[in-house]
C-alpha cells in the first residue's frame, strides 16, 4: 500500500499487551460466555460445545488494566437460551479464559461491577446484581458459602 497513515502489523504486535498498554486511557471490551461470582471468565466453551479460542482476550484485558487511566470491560447478556440459563454462574461450565485476578469491570444489561482489587467475598456481592433477577437468590445462596469461608 502507499498510504503512510496506515501501518499493517501482525497480531504479535497489535495484540501485544505491552504495546497496547502504552496507549493512555485505553478501554478494551471483550465478550464472554459466562462469568462466575468471583470474576473468572469463560469465553471459549458452553457445556460440551467448544465455541472458539481466546482470540486475544487475555492480551486485551491485560492491556486495558495496564494502560494509564484505562479499563478492561467484559460485557455479556445476563442470560442465555431465552432467559433459561444465567450467564452469571456459581461455577464455570468451561475453561477459565481470563483469570479472576485480571478481571476489572463486568457489565450486563443490569449494571456494571468493578472487581479489580476486591476480595472474593466483595466480588460476589458486586456480581449478583448483574444477574437476571430470576437467578439472584440461588446465586446469593452460593455466594454465602464463599463469604462464610472468609475470602
Model-predicted segments: where are they?
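Conserved phosphate- and dinucleotide-binding cores of soluble alpha/beta proteins
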Residues: 1-151
Amino acid at each position: 500500500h502507499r498510504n503512510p497513515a496506515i501501518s499493517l502489523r501482525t497480531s504479535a504486535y497489535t495484540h501485544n499487551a505491552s504495546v497496547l498498554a502504552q496507549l493512555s486511557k485505553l478501554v478494551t471490551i471483550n465478550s464472554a460466555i459466562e462469568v462466575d461470582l468471583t470474576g473468572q471468565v469463560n469465553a471459549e466453551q458452553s457445556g460440551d460445545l467448544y465455541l472458539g479460542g481466546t482470540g486475544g482476550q487475555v492480551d486485551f484485558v491485560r492491556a486495558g488494566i495496564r494502560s494509564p487511566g484505562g479499563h478492561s470491560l467484559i460485557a455479556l447478556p445476563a442470560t442465555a437460551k431465552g432467559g433459561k440459563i444465567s450467564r452469571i454462574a456459581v461455577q464455570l461450565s468451561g475453561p477459565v479464559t481470563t483469570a479472576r485476578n485480571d478481571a476489572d469491570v463486568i457489565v450486563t444489561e443490569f449494571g456494571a461491577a468493578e472487581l479489580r482489587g476486591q476480595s472474593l467475598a466483595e466480588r460476589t456481592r458486586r456480581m449478583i446484581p448483574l444477574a437476571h433477577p430470576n437467578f439472584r437468590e440461588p446465586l446469593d445462596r452460593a455466594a454465602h458459602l464463599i463469604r462464610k469461608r472468609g475470602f
